[in-house]
């Protein structure tokens, strides 16, 4: 960007589950921590223990036994602005150790987010943190940049929301975006439920984090769900054991693939929606007939909920079944896709051509928060 160390842009990808933050031009985020704010469940007994009234991120996670944990971002939308400010404050001052008033800041948001949401983000950045400039980018578009493409369809599945976003020459096609409020957190909840049927009880916010870990370590997507169920019923070859923090060992079998199967069959959790393979197909079908071929050949997976082993093969199989038989279909699953939104942001914010795109403090002062709709596409 420049030889000046001072003006590196900051990139902050605020996910429903994890905040990924760092400096533009880096190849990975410096700070990755849970988007959690925890408050003590009980009044502190011991005087002088210096108990804080709130904890953020990893500290909240490690003290989860005595805290009530809340996620300020639900389904990709910020629902609790006070907590969100705490998270940003923690990001700038404790994790990155920078003064936000010295750095342009790139934030990300989910496609089809309410307009008021990005206005409020803009307002807080300029008024609370006094950033010199900022920009709000759409997550899926950044993931596509990170994969080195400007055209393709992104399946972005995070902790709070899943989308299929067709992008052509760098622009998202809003009329064809499919949004599904079914993502990692719902899968964790579903796994909690089906483990209960096995006789293991997980209820508190702290225990939910244990189940999330089980999900991340042991779950996978079956290529053929019925076959896999039959295999699981007739042999114990698919069973795996997991040691809980208290030393108890639990065994998990068909739950390993029943949990992420929900992505393809949302009826498992009582949702009437189509699965991610169908929404991808529907999204492509809403696009102009001339660009469909390019979209089919560039299905890019992004986000933590696409990290399940077997998901790319299953998507390939399902979309091939829906698409015209002569169509070439390619699923791209970059190994770093957990962070591809952040990486795309890092690339974008360090491009020389992007520097005129920032919303400056001056522009904000003249036009107010609504400037974000004019400048950020």
From Swiss-Prot:
SUPFAM superfamilies noted in UniProt: Actin-like ATPase domain
Gene Ontology cellular-component terms listed: cytoplasm; cytoskeleton
Pfam families in the cross-refs: Actin
EC number: 3.6.4.-
Keyword Acetylation: yes
Modified residues (N-acetylcysteine): 2
Residues recorded as bearing N6-methyllysine in the entry: 86
Gene3D superfamilies on file: 3.30.420.40, Actin, Chain A, domain 4
Keywords, ordered alphabetically: Acetylation, ATP-binding, Cytoplasm, Cytoskeleton, Hydrolase, Methylation, Muscle protein, Nucleotide-binding, Oxidation
Modified residues (Methionine (R)-sulfoxide): 46, 49
Quaternary structure (record): Polymerization of globular actin (G-actin) leads to a structural filament (F-actin) in the form of a two-stranded helix. Each actin can bind to 4 others.
Record-stated family: Belongs to the actin family.
Record's function text: Actins are highly conserved proteins that are involved in various types of cell motility and are ubiquitously expressed in all eukaryotic cells.
Listed name of the protein: Actin, alpha skeletal muscle
Source organism of the structure: Carassius auratus
Gene responsible for this protein: acta1
């Amino acid at each position: 960007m420049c030889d000046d160390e001072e003006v590196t842009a900051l990139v902050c990808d605020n996910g429903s589950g994890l905040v990924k933050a760092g400096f533009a031009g880096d190849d990975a985020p410096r700070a990755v921590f849970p988007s959690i704010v925890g408050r003590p469940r009980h009044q502190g007994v011991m005087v002088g223990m210096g108990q804080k009234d709130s904890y953020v991120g990893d500290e909240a996670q490690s003290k989860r036994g005595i805290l009530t944990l809340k996620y300020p971002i639900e389904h990709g939308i910020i629902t609790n602005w006070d907590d969100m400010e705490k998270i940003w404050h923690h990001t700038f001052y404790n994790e990155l150790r920078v003064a936000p008033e010295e750095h342009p800041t790139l934030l990300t948001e989910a496609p089809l987010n309410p307009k008021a949401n990005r206005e409020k983000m803009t307002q807080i950045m300029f008024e609370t943190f006094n950033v010199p400039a900022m920009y709000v980018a759409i997550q899926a578009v950044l993931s596509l940049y990170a994969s080195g493409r400007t055209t393709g369809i992104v399946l972005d599945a995070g902790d709070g929301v899943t989308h299929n976003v067709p992008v052509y020459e760098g622009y998202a096609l809003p009329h064809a975006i499919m949004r599904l409020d079914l993502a990692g957190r719902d899968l964790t909840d579903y796994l909690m439920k089906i483990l209960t049927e096995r006789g293991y009880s997980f209820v508190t916010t702290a225990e939910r984090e244990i189940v999330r870990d089980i999900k991340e370590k042991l779950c996978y997507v079956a290529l053929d769900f019925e076959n896999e169920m039959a295999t699981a019923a007739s042999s114990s070859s698919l069973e795996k054991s997991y040691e809980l923090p208290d030393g108890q060992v639990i065994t998990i079998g068909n739950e390993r693939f029943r949990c992420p199967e929900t992505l393809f069959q949302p009826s498992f959790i009582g949702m009437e929606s189509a699965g991610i393979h169908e929404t991808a197909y529907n999204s492509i079908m809403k696009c102009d007939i001339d660009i469909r071929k390019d979209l089919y050949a560039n299905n890019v997976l992004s986000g933590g909920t696409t990290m399940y082993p077997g998901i790319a093969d299953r998507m390939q199989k399902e979309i091939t079944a829906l698409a015209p038989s002569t169509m070439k279909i390619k699923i791209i699953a970059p190994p770093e896709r957990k962070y591809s939104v952040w990486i795309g942001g890092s690339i974008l914010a360090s491009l020389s051509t992007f520097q005129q795109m920032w919303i400056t403090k001056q522009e904000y002062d003249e036009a107010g928060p609504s400037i974000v709709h004019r400048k950020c596409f």
